[in-house]
Amino acid sequence: MRRALLVLVAAFALPGTADAAPQPSRWCGTDVQAGDRQPDAVAGFQFHVVYAFPADGGDGFAQLVLPIARDLAAIDEWWRAQDASRAPRFDLFPFPGCDTEFGNLDISRVQLPQAASAYSSDRTGFRSILVDLGGFDDPDKKYMVFYDGPVDDPFVCGRSPSNPLAGGANAIAVVYVRSLCEGLGSAAEIAVTTVHELIHNLGALPEGAPHPCPPDQGGDGHPCDGEQDVLFPSTSGGDVLSAKVLDLGRDDYYGHGGPQWDVQDSPWLEQLQSPDRLPPTAPARLNVTSRGGNVTLSWPAAADDGGAVRYRVYRDGAPVQETQATSFRDLAREGATVEYAVRARDGVNHLGERRAIRFTVGLGIVDEQGRLVRDTVAPGPVRSLRARRAGSRVTLSWGAAADRGRVRSYRVTRNGRQVAVTARRVLTVAASRARGVWAVRAVDRAGNLGVAGASLRLR
């Protein structure tokens, strides 16, 4: 956004009702933390707020944290006035004795590792901020960073990627507090910048929008059908948020009903009209087994007051699938240790508590140190099943099955029905009862039934 030339740039590549939360009179944080406080007081995809400053810069957190919270409360109020059915979902923490929603805003304070000169350039500095933030990589969160350091081009007020369905390190927006955008805490230019970059982060301007700007006016990341639009690429200065409109004409990026991506559908927006206010439950437990490199993760169904849920499956912290089923199949290298997690997601994008489990392929469920907690890996197949007849008796014998936890017994079946369980690798039966198809499967000390191996037909 440029002021007279102030420029807002797109870097390509628990609200309960429609009533806005009151302005906070104080930020209720009782500590200063560089990380994301847990537990979250909001259930769902959300924006986490970060105050960042360079290694050689002054720490203005104490002075700026309340103005930041007040601007975000004003953004919440403005958004609900524009669309009574939606509002951005911000990360809150249940600070004790706090009587306002945005007083509970979870704001992290981060001193970046490099001097201000590393972050002052518009483009390379933006990338350096993203790299040096580190640790803000929750795939279910987007990040709004208020950077308190000098910038080479003070007309550039902020920058954000446009990643509609991404969270984590690929979804970090930056607002430059020391640009010529002014009015932090008073719903003025900084608030306009913040909304502008937030909307970019939610996926605007989508390809196919009817009013993209020409390259010399901000490019196709912005609409050019009117300066009142909060996503217009520049401002003449002195703007206030109340004078701005969320998608002028409602035909470019919000509530348009067209074929292009619609920010109104973003899972990072709370659906205020829905009676569903509670998140789904977490799966009661996870179970994971493997045979070779084939891994099967399963869990009991979660419950939700709004009905059906889907499940987000994560591998080593990254989402890999979303499914209605209560199981997930994966391929992993034998001996590799993988962390799997599952969260239930309801129809209005509330997320249940994450349930996680660590698994070593070919060994079983392990703790943080890699020690075996529960053997869930089936023994290998029984090989070389043989039969020898001696008079009226038939003796079956077989080779050992492989299992890291050691085999406890072998289950012997004839025509699919169990006839014996033995710790030995030999079984003698009457010849008159030997006709049929015989098979043997190992059972390990944890009770896992082994993979089916060779069978033997006796006549």
Residue ranges, per PLM feature:
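Beta-strand-rich modules
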Residues: D330-H350, A431-L449
